[in-house]
């Protein structure tokens, strides 16, 4: 690969000689021949991408450093949901910047995910303890989205018979914006004030409100209880360390952002939000829940619980469309709480509250009117006609305060605030700080202890904390250990050079509402990225706001909805979705107010064009959209894609292109050229943002020219229809994708796509003699992934797809995608980053497993006692004094005999009991007093 600059060769796994060998195995003379066979000619892009020439790692880092150097990092006192933090270096280095943590996938395979599951379990425990509510999910996308999701829970609780939502206090403007976006298609009536009626599903109580004030909500809460409405608290989790838990004053749900638990502002994200609920709401809560169960030998083990709630199973009836959440940031927040412990957290909160109280007292002594009497960290001051002037003076001193209106400013303190800041800020109002540590929260203090669990008291030295995080990471299998061949997930390299800028001061420490002239680096970087993504996809405009692929789907469908409404066709509400679609598609369509009509697929996996045409024509007067994944979820380039788009357009609909499989298209074909009107791009798949063990992700959307006016807006930009709290969503991790594209260039991106297609076809070729490859396209080719039909083992030996998945752990692999999109099969996606050696190792393992299944079929091993049925095998099980199995210990843990003991991955638990875990749901660690 000498014709490319160094990074391209570093990113792509197969060497030239490997490429030649794989092509030879396929009987092909060249890569060009493979692409000609695999990718339909009518969709191919017959020109090079018009992108800047590739740079080396050093040059790209230097260029991005210059760009982000245009940002002016000043100390923020803006607040409004975003706060300065001190990220403990032990957490930054050993968790946030550690590939063992950030390259892991969502922990669906629990046996190889015990480390991050344990820390997410502690996150849930932390949230439950702070809020006083028994059940918490393992993060949502941001605070604004979490409020909207909680409202959705309330409406589902009332079986959609109530639709009125009462905002009982002043929420942050971006939260109201997101709630209003969510409300319109779902028919929610958003009201303000204190009037609770019989149609009120929930009241939303800020704790404190956007002005920093703790209001008196006793009467409206009592009225809500009397009327059967649920109470949702929007609560600051740092304040909750010293303030009364929401459950104590009647909250049924609590939501908020965990950003100030050690996670930088990052110009808006990513940050983990929390949601906690009463026990009665457990089964309708959105997001993933970590539960505690046991393994086959009775050892405690963690797993994702109640998965039947999720969209890949419930589809348009799911509790939410959220798939990727913010697991990495939730783990950071949990680690922050473990590092500081309850006393440390309270010390931080008390100091912040004292600074705010002293500032408030100083202003009052100087005759300045402030809002409210009960405060935590924020003081809102009335300064008639002087807001801009005071903010400008603060800016000159290197501090940013919030301009609420021409007559009002807000000042928010955080853990980075100092005595010097207090004095300087007070002087802007002609005031001097007064002494004392009085906190203005009379009668609202936390009266009970919290976080008594041992884990929050055991890691005070850095040595202990470092080893704790290492022990957790060692339990897991991430990309730093082995290939993760998950179909439809694109687990490719997250290069160090791409990741490094995320920690830069000029990237991490800007408030999303900082003045525009101080964030010119972000403006340039995001402008570059939007232009590059437009060129890659062929679209006219891009929004970077959606902070997950599911949010991208929602944003794209909402753009279609608003387009139809603007043309006087708001009645268009039918969304055609193939039966093969990912579950987020119908879930997102439902959230966008659309009714789902399923389009059948043919036995060969392709969409049934006759069924599509019939249903499009049947619903032509009300057709809103058609959602299609391409290549298909079956891993095939369907020849009829352009015809599908024409049918939909001819019947008045718009084509939504799910970009989950964009890794098979970049540089070879463009969604807009194919006929799509809108497409979301998973930057955490195709464009190298890591999965983080279940988030963060970024799901920007590209749209055709006629849809550009309907891209998500933001209240800070003077526009509407935001789908996320910050204008650029998870802005700080956009630099990862910027670096990837800048170092690859157009030719490198195309080469990566070709390598991904080659790797998948090579795997299909090697395995097809042992397992049927379920779907192929023209010339018997697949796209970038293939479905391996392991049901042949079930038929011959009773070996299930789960047995195969768990046995792969003994071979040192994360299993491919299991039982999706076809039950009983495995879908394999190698990506371009895996070298031939690792690909061959996976193929060898799959072939060896088929050989093991044959021994079961032949009666050599019993059906109920064999290495597959008992997989995975732990070290403790293997070292047990008694070994009663009909296979040897070596066959159990070093299958095939050729596996290097020095590279052995040992799962910490054997197969986890999923059914028992759901029947006996435990999703937080009980307080120590419980054991008394």
Swiss-Prot record:
EC id: 1.4.4.2
- Record-level Gene Ontology MF annotations: glycine binding; glycine dehydrogenase (decarboxylating) activity; pyridoxal phosphate binding
Q: Which UniProt keywords apply?
A: Oxidoreductase, Pyridoxal phosphate
Q: Which SUPFAM superfamilies does this chain map to?
A: PLP-dependent transferases (SSF53383)
Which BP terms in the Gene Ontology apply to this protein? glycine decarboxylation via glycine cleavage system
What reactions does this protein catalyze?
A: N(6)-[(R)-lipoyl]-L-lysyl-[glycine-cleavage complex H protein] + glycine + H(+) = N(6)-[(R)-S(8)-aminomethyldihydrolipoyl]-L-lysyl-[glycine-cleavage complex H protein] + CO2
Q: Which residues carry this modification: N6-(pyridoxal phosphate)lysine?
A: 685
The terms describing its cellular component in GO are: cytosol; glycine cleavage complex
State its cofactor.
pyridoxal 5'-phosphate
Q: Which InterPro entries match?
A: GcvP, GDC-P_C, GDC-P_N, GDC_P, PyrdxlP-dep_Trfase, PyrdxlP-dep_Trfase_major, PyrdxlP-dep_Trfase_small
Q: Classify the source by domain of life.
A: Bacteria
- HAMAP family named in the record: GcvP (MF_00711)
Question: What does the subunit section of this Swiss-Prot or TrEMBL entry state?
Answer: The glycine cleavage system is composed of four proteins: P, T, L and H.
- Function, as annotated: The glycine cleavage system catalyzes the degradation of glycine. The P protein binds the alpha-amino group of glycine through its pyridoxal phosphate cofactor; CO(2) is released and the remaining methylamine moiety is then transferred to the lipoamide cofactor of the H protein.
Q: Which family does it belong to?
A: Belongs to the GcvP family.
Protein name (record) = Glycine dehydrogenase (decarboxylating)
């Amino acid at each position: 690969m000498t014709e490319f600059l160094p990074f391209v060769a570093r990113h792509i796994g197969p060497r030239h000689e490997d490429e030649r060998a794989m092509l030879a195995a396929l009987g092909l003379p060249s890569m060009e021949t493979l692409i000609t066979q695999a990718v339909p000619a009518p969709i191919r892009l017959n020109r090079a991408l018009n992108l800047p020439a590739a740079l080396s790692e050093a040059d790209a880092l230097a260029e991005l450093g210059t760009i982000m150097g245009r940002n002016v990092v000043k100390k923020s006192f803006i607040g409004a949901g975003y706060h300065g933090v001190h990220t403990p270096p032990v957490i930054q280095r050993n968790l946030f910047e550690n590939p063992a943590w950030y390259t892991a996938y969502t922990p669906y395979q629990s046996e190889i995910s015990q480390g991050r599951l344990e820390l997410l379990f502690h996150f849930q425990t932390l949230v439950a303890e702070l809020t006083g509510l028994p059940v918490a999910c393992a993060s949502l996308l941001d605070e604004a989205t979490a409020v909207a999701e909680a409202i959705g829970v309330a409406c589902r609780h009332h079986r959609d018979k109530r639709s009125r939502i009462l905002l009982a206090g002043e929420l942050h403007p971006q939260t109201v914006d997101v709630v209003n976006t969510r409300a319109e298609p779902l028919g929610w009536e958003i009201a303000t004030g204190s009037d609770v009626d019989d149609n009120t599903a929930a009241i939303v109580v800020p704790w404190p409100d956007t002005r920093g004030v703790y209001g008196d909500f006793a009467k409206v809460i009592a009225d809500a209880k009397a009327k059967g409405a649920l109470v949702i608290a929007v609560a600051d989790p740092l304040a909750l360390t010293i303030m009364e838990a929401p459950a104590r004053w009647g909250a049924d749900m609590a939501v908020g952002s965990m950003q100030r638990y050690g996670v930088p502002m990052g110009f808006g994200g990513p940050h983990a939000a929390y949601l906690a609920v009463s026990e009665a709401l457990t089964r309708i809560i959105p997001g993933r829940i970590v539960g505690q169960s046991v393994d086959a030998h009775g050892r405690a083990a963690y797993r994702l619980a109640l998965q039947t709630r999720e969209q890949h199973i419930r589809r348009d009836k799911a509790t939410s469309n959220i798939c990727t959440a913010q697991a990495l940031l939730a783990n950071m927040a949990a680690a922050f709480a473990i590092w500081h412990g309850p006393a440390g957290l309270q010390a931080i909160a008390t100091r912040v509250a004292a600074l705010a109280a002293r500032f408030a007292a100083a202003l009052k002594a100087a005759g300045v009117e402030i809002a409210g009497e009960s405060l935590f960290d924020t003081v809102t001051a009335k300064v008639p006609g002087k807001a801009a002037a005071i903010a400008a003076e603060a800016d000159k001193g290197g501090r940013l305060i919030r301009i609420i209106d021409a007559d009002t400013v807000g000042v928010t303190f955080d853990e980075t605030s100092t005595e010097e800041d207090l004095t300087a800020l007070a002087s802007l109002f002609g005031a001097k700080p007064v002494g004392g540590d009085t906190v203005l929260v009379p009668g609202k203090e936390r009266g009970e202890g919290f976080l008594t669990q041992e884990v929050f008291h055991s890691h005070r030295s850095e040595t202990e904390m470092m080893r704790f995080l290492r022990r957790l990471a060692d339990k897991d299998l991430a990309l730093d250990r082995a290939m993760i061949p998950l179909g439809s997930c694109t687990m490719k390299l997250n290069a160090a050079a791409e990741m490094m800028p995320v920690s830069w001061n000029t990237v991490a420490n800007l408030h999303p509402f900082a003045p525009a002239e101080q964030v010119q680096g972000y403006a340039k970087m995001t402008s570059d990225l939007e232009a590059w993504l437009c060129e890659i996809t062929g679209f006219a405009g891009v929004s970077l706001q959606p902070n997950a692929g599911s949010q991208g789907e929602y944003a794209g469908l909402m753009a279609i909805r608003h387009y139809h409404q603007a043309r006087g066709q708001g009645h268009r509400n039918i969304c055609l979705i193939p039966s093969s679609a990912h579950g987020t598609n119908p879930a997102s369509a439902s959230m966008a107010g659309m009714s789902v009509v399923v389009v059948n697929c043919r036995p060969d996996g392709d969409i049934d064009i006759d069924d599509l045409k019939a249903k499009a024509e049947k619903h032509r007067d009300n057709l809103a959209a058609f959602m299609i994944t391409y290549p298909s979820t079956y891993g095939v380039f369907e020849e009829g894609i352009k015809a599908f788009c024409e049918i939909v357009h001819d019947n008045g609909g718009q084509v939504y292109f799910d970009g989950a499989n964009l890794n098979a298209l970049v540089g070879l074909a463009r969604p807009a050229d194919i006929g799509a009107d809108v497409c979301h791009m998973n930057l955490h798949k195709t464009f190298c943002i890591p999965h983080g063990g279940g988030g963060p992700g970024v799901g920007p959307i590209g749209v055709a020219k006629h849809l550009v006016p309907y891209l998500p807006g933001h209240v800070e930009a003077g526009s509407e229809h935001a789908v996320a709290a910050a204008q650029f969503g998870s802005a700080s991790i956009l630099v990862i994708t910027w670096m990837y594209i800048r170092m690859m260039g157009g030719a490198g991106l195309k080469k990566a796509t070709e390598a991904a297609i080659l790797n998948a076809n090579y795997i299909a070729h090697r395995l097809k003699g042992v397992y049927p490859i379920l779907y192929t396209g023209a010339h018997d080719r697949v796209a970038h992934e293939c479905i391996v039909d392991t049901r042949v083992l079930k038929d011959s030996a009773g070996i299930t797809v789960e047995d195969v998945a768990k046995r792969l752990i003994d071979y040192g692999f994360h299993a491919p995608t299991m039982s999706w999109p076809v039950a009983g099969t495995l879908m394999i996606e190698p990506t371009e980053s895996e070298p031939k050696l690792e690909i061959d190792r996976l193929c060898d393992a799959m072939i060896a497993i088929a050989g093991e299944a044959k021994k079961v079929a032949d009666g050599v091993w019993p059906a109920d006692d064999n290495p597959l049925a008992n997989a995975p095998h732990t070290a403790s099980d293997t070292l047990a004094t008694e070994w009663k199995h009909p296979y040897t210990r070596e066959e159990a843990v070093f299958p095939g005999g050729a596996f290097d003991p020095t590279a052995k991955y040992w799962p910490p638990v054997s197969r986890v009991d999923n059914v028992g875990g759901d029947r006996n749901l435990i999703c937080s660690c009980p307080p120590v007093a419980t054991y008394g």
